[in-house]
Amino acid sequence: MSFYEYIQTFKDDKTPLGELVIWIKEDDSFPKQEKLTENILSYFHQMSNIDHEFLEIVKRSLSLYDQLKS
């Protein structure tokens, strides 16, 4: 399962992860087939308009994704 597929499970959640779903869905460049958390985190790091709080949400979602894959 790609990270994109995983994060869609939080669709309609009234949580920061639900907000992340919306943000990712609106990003036409998001690597939808990517499965490696390092590559996903690198994708977010290269964006200049990401604040620290948002990046922490991304890291939390990647941690949950890694737990699922284990």
Regions found by a protein language model. Give the residues of each.
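Short intrinsically disordered terminal tails
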Residues: M1, Q67-S70
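N-terminal acidic leader/helix
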Residues: M1-D27
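Aromatic side chains
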Residues: F3-Y6, F30, Y43, Y65
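Short alpha-helix boundary/capping elements
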Residues: K11-T15, D28-Q33, S48-N49, D66
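Amphipathic alpha-helical segments that form the core helices of the histone-fold
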Residues: W23-P31, I40-H45
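Short, charge-rich amphipathic interface segments used for partner binding and complex assembly
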Residues: L36-Q67
